[in-house]
């Protein structure tokens, strides 16, 4: 009788715990998440696959908040309408822009609007202001959006009539703690590489094989301390002689933007992981440290001299990079593209590759000397702009790029690529351009497919080790990946001048039965194979209370005896708690 009472008591405890778990789960259903929440589009508005709900707490934005509106990269253009503006040499002031609620397949975001003629919208500068719904201290709005990266901020109006744009207090851009620079806007990613807009499939953060990003300082040409952003690829400590990409921001920008709003680190992460790019370091410049507008010739000469005489020596002294100019690239957007053209003009010997994005060039027949032409014939040049980029359709760009530089490069047989991206003078264009530059232009190095010389497509049992021999030089080995997951270096051995990898049985036992994909990553290539794990035949049939369970000979875990009320109560508690946890 006493055992029955104990059993009933334990069941009661289980029931109480289950109810409490249920109450906790239900209480969270109605919780409001500040920041952004991304789900499938159920608004019935637009053809976008996703919807994003923005929620901000006005008490975190100061006192006497009168109203909050959303602004950011939520203006779109129809791709079918872009050619007219290009062909007619029109300013993008005349282009029709569409809101997020009007999105259709084939549209793409273009940063800010070129005009504010549509009176159904409110604007702050060139950005549509999306009204938010107030509920006590919370403001919210939901936008249907296609898959890409977006920047945004909140336009806050106060009771005294003043207004300011602020970042999301729960999702600010990452700050450089050395000088307090940040990317000015909050940002987020929608969707994934499989459904991203054209040119954006490499921008998404990885969940493995990721590089790191940090900030450093150097002494500039004028004796002052200036900041650099430094991206280091995954496995940096294992390699040497890394190639280097120097990136310049646009007018008013700084060293934080390229790897946040521009996703440059993510793009390189993905390209390296997929064998599309040799291991490379990125150095993001802070050209706003120097005086000048960014379009002034004297200022750009200073920038060029500073990167050659100060930045490159600092990087080569403190980081494991190649000192060969053919392993360096310089690219920039907008004003940074102007800087890139100046670097190409006065320091062509210092780089092997130049990227001029959304920028006119300060170059003419007087500058394009026979000496410069001779030096550029061993370089690669990439030029790009957006479909409705004022850097493409304004008269300055047309005269300097379309009418002068491209014909000149053709005439002198200089290797160049000119590409138009979907977008305006904005990050959608610049991310797409950088992806092409890194993936298709850089390094003149095709990805090397190394061979598995022994151990390819092998069948092994769970209790066995796996030995793989390759033709990869040991000095080039970087990492081992199984099923898209990097394997901890301490869990396998690497030996030989041409590497042999041994996966011990302890590692094999952690993998599931069936086929697996193994990839050995080298500095400039990879080797890959499949292997198959079959079940260990050394198993026991264990009979306990008329129940048969199959267990390894090394371990045998039995279910509790069901005729023991005490153990049954504990078992019931375990099952119910497991179910509650799932709820």
Which ranges hold each PLM region?
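Aromatic-rich carbohydrate-binding modules that target alpha-glucans
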Residues: 45, 53-147, 157-190
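Intrinsically disordered, low-complexity repeat and linker tracts
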Residues: 23-31, 446-459, 480, 525-578
């Amino acid at each position: 009788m006493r055992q029955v009472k104990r059993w009933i008591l334990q069941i009661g405890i289980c029931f109480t715990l289950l109810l409490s778990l249920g109450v906790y789960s239900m209480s969270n259903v109605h919780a409001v998440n500040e920041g952004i929440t991304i789900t499938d589009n159920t608004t019935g508005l637009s053809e976008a696959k996703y919807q994003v709900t923005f929620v901000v707490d006005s008490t975190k934005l100061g006192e006497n908040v009168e109203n909050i509106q959303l602004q950011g990269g939520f203006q779109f253009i129809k791709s079918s309408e872009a050619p007219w503006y290009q062909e007619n040499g029109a300013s993008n002031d005349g282009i029709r822009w569409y809101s997020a609620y009007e999105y259709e397949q084939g549209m793409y975001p273009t940063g800010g609007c070129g005009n504010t003629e549509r009176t159904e919208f409110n604007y702050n500068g060139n950005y549509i202001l999306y009204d938010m719904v107030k509920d006590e201290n919370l403001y919210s709005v939901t936008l249907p959006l296609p898959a890409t990266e977006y920047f945004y901020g909140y336009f806050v109006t106060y009771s005294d009539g003043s207004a300011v744009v602020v970042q999301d207090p729960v999702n600010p851009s990452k700050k450089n703690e050395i000088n307090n620079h940040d990317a000015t806007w909050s940002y987020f990613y929608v969707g994934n590489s499989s459904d991203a807009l054209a040119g954006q499939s490499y921008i998404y953060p990885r969940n493995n094989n990721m590089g790191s990003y940090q900030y450093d300082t150097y002494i500039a040409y004028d004796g002052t301390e200036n900041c650099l952003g430094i991206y280091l690829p995954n496995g940096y400590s294992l390699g040497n002689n890394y190639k280097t990409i120097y990136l310049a921001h646009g007018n008013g920008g700084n060293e934080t933007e390229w790897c946040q709003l521009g996703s440059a680190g993510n793009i390189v992460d993905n390209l390296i992981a997929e064998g599309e790019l040799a291991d490379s370091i990125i150095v993001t410049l802070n050209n706003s440290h120097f005086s000048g507008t960014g379009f002034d010739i004297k200022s750009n000469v200073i920038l060029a001299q500073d990167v050659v005489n100060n930045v490159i020596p600092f990087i080569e002294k403190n980081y494991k990079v190649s000192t060969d100019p053919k392993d360096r690239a310089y690219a920039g957007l907008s004003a940074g593209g102007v800087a890139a053209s100046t670097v190409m003009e006065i320091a062509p010997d210092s780089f092997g590759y130049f990227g001029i994005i959304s920028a006119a060039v300060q170059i003419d027949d007087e500058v394009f000397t026979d000496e410069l032409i001779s030096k550029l014939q061993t370089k690669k040049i990439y030029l790009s702009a957006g479909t409705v980029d004022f850097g493409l359709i304004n008269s300055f760009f047309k005269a300097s790029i379309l009418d002068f530089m491209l014909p000149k490069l053709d005439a002198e047989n200089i290797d160049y690529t000119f590409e138009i991206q979907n977008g305006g003078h904005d990050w959608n264009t610049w991310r797409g351009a950088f992806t092409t530059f890194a993936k298709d232009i850089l390094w003149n190095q095709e990805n090397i497919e190394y061979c598995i010389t022994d151990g390819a497509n092998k069948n092994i049992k769970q209790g066995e080790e796996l030995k793989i021999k390759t033709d990869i030089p040991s000095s080039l080995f970087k990492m081992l990946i199984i099923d898209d997951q990097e394997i901890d270096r301490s869990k396998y051995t690497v030996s030989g001048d041409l590497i042999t990898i041994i996966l011990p049985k302890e590692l094999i036992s952690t993998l599931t039965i069936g086929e697996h994909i193994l990839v050995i990553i080298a500095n400039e290539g990879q080797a890959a194979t499949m292997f198959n794990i079959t079940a260990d035949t050394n198993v026991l049939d264990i009979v306990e209370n008329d129940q048969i369970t199959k267990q390894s000979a090394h371990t045998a875990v039995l279910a509790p005896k069901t005729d023991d009320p005490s153990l049954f109560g504990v078992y019931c508690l375990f099952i119910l708690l497991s179910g509650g946890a799932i709820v």
